[in-house]
Amino acid sequence: MNYYSINLAKAHLLNYPCPLNINFLWNYGFLLGIIFFIQILTGVFLASRYTPEISYAYYSIQHILRELWSGWCFRYMHATGASLVFLLTYLHILRGLNYSYLYLPLSWISGLIIFALFIVTAFIGYVLPWGQMSYWGATVITNLLSSIPVLVIWLCGGYTVSDPTIKRFFVLHFILPFVALCIVFIHIFFLHLHGSTNPLGYDTALKIPFYPNLLSLDVKGFNNIFILFLLQSIFGIIPLSHPDNAILVNTYVTPIQIVPEWYFLPFYAMLKTIPSKTAGLLIVLASLQLLFLLAEQRSLTTIIQFKMTFGAREYSVPMIWFMCSFYALLWIGCQLPQDIFILYGRLFIISFFSSGLFALVHYKRTHYDYSSQANIKITRLR
């Protein structure tokens, strides 16, 4: 029975029908899976030599870097892999916003759950080196979460970031990637259940098998991203690292500016430009909820016809503003909290939510035309 199941899965993967006109934008999911696997592999090796205790955490990282054979390589590959995971995730979501992936709500929602787990896992992992920036970043974020009763005390093991905090963060950082891996398999199952989308946004009978045609496209993309991954891990990770995080924690000295990793900057800009910490936290949660709400603009009984592409002008304009506002918040997040950047941040927060809600409401109101879909079916039958 097991042998039959393996053969059935193998035949499905080899003969999986894919649209003829998909391009390199459909390569990001495969690349995400490869980089995520490298993250888990390097993370397991690093966890075997890491000591989750505030007196030894920083020195265990230095031991891995300086004394362990190839330890620096594993540590830098793990740090670079985190950036690549979020870069590919943002590109993957961007492709989904442009090319009708929202019309597969199960795949879209499961993918966003994976994205949320990535955010939590990356933040927890950022605290583990126990550098100056790690400690103060954890202090700021946990203070923001203090508006939720009992959560901070349960998460930190007390009222401040201390030894129980780093122990709990280490355990969560080790477990959450495997939880995300389980949801990745569910995400792939839903994708294969409905089939892949294509740039035109409508179902087509012109399909080709995954092997060897599209597998060669995935291998080509993997070669390109792996070269970038190695170059960044070996040569580019030190210049991009924040120097304050290479300093042992000093609880009496605050850094000039608390700067998280670049993939947190849009959410950090929302927190930084809103004076109330509770309101800032609600806005961050609302920004994630807005992505979930976009999955509501679909109808499983209709055929997708050139929807959610840049050709649909009444849809593309607010969606372009939605994406541009997100990347503007990314830039504002790395700036000093001056009045001009706070003003720009609030304006782009308004633009982010208004354009996203306008795209949701306007597109849902104007594109549920069941009669036109019926006419398309009749025309095809003729």
Swiss-Prot record:
GO cellular component, one term: mitochondrial inner membrane
Main location: mitochondrion
GO molecular function: metal ion binding; ubiquinol-cytochrome-c reductase activity
UniProt record, GO biological process: mitochondrial electron transport, ubiquinol to cytochrome c
Membrane topology per record: Multi-pass membrane protein
Keyword Transcription regulation: no
Stored SUPFAM superfamilies: a domain/subunit of cytochrome bc1 complex (Ubiquinol-cytochrome c reductase), Transmembrane di-heme cytochromes
Alphabetized UniProt keyword annotations: Electron transport, Heme, Iron, Membrane, Metal-binding, Mitochondrion, Mitochondrion inner membrane, Respiratory chain, Transmembrane, Transmembrane helix, Transport, Ubiquinone
Protein purpose: Component of the ubiquinol-cytochrome c reductase complex (complex III or cytochrome b-c1 complex) that is part of the mitochondrial respiratory chain. The b-c1 complex mediates electron transfer from ubiquinol to cytochrome c. Contributes to the generation of a proton gradient across the mitochondrial membrane that is then used for ATP synthesis.
Protein's name in the database: Cytochrome b
Organism: Plasmodium vivax (strain Salvador I)
